[in-house]
A protein has these predicted regions:
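Hydrophobic cores of alpha-helical transmembrane segments in multi-pass inner/ER membrane proteins
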Residues: 39-56, 102-108, 166-182
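A generic, lipid-embedded transmembrane alpha helix
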Residues: 2-18
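Membrane-interface helix caps and helix-loop-helix hairpins in membrane proteins
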Residues: 84-96, 114-118
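Short aromatic-rich membrane-water interface segments that cap or initiate transmembrane helices
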Residues: 27-42, 155-169
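Hydrophobic alpha-helical transmembrane segments in multi-pass integral membrane proteins
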Residues: 136-151
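Membrane-interface capping segments at transmembrane-helix boundaries
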Residues: 61-62, 114-116, 181-189
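Hydrophobic, membrane-inserted alpha-helices
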Residues: 76-86, 103-108
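Alpha-helical transmembrane segments in multipass membrane proteins, preferentially the mid-helix core
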Residues: 103-122
Length: 189
């Protein structure tokens, strides 16, 4: 969990510094690390841990769920779609970086497919679909209050309720990075 958390904290701190988004101090405890509210830093550890639990439950309780050409095609298609988003919206930092980072990571998985045989794309897609339900509820509250304030000049201004559509892919990359690192763990027998 540490490498993705460090990556995201750096990304988040940079975007906060250049005003891609900001945090409303009325809703934070007032402790700041790396220019981010403490709650935001802790998010990058707590949320992936919960998401890995959901992913592992899918793996354990649904052993018949296997990676197929369909699940791999869906994930690869997401990579193509977000890369297209990055190219079209190259002048919008949130859209561009989120699309580019997720596309590169997905294509990296496919490039190293033989070495990353442990990755289970079907379980990832099902678990991420489940994760999106609480994500939409909590993120909807955070963006509606607003705890997190987005600079619309840096995203495509397409929202699901009050949530920028890029947040879905931002979260997907966070979960995907953690799942890949988790699956590389040694198996204890």
């Amino acid at each position: 969990m540490m490498p993705p958390a460090v990556f995201y904290i750096i990304w988040d701190a940079w975007f906060t510094k250049i005003n891609v988004w900001s945090f409303n101090p009325a809703y934070t405890v007032g402790i700041s690390l790396f220019g981010l509210p403490l709650e935001e830093v802790l998010f990058f550890f707590a949320v992936p841990y919960c998401c890995l639990f959901i992913y592992e439950c899918i793996r354990v309780y649904f052993p018949a769920l296997k990676t197929t050409v369909v699940s791999e095609t869906i994930l690869f298609s997401i990579g193509i779609a977000v890369l297209i988003m990055a190219v079209i919206f190259y002048d919008k930092k949130y859209s561009f970086c989120t699309g580019l980072f997720l596309a590169v990571f997905i294509f990296f998985l496919y490039y190293l497919k033989k070495k990353l045989q442990f990755f289970h794309s079907a379980a990832f897609l099902v678990s991420y679909g489940i994760i999106l339900l609480p994500f939409m509820a909590v993120n909807g509250v955070l963006t509606a209050l607003p705890v997190v304030i987005y600079n619309n000049a840096e995203n495509i201004s397409c929202r699901i309720f009050s949530i920028p559509v890029e947040d879905i892919f931002y979260g997907m990359l966070l979960v995907l990075m953690n799942v890949v690192l988790y699956e590389r763990r040694p198996v204890i027998k």
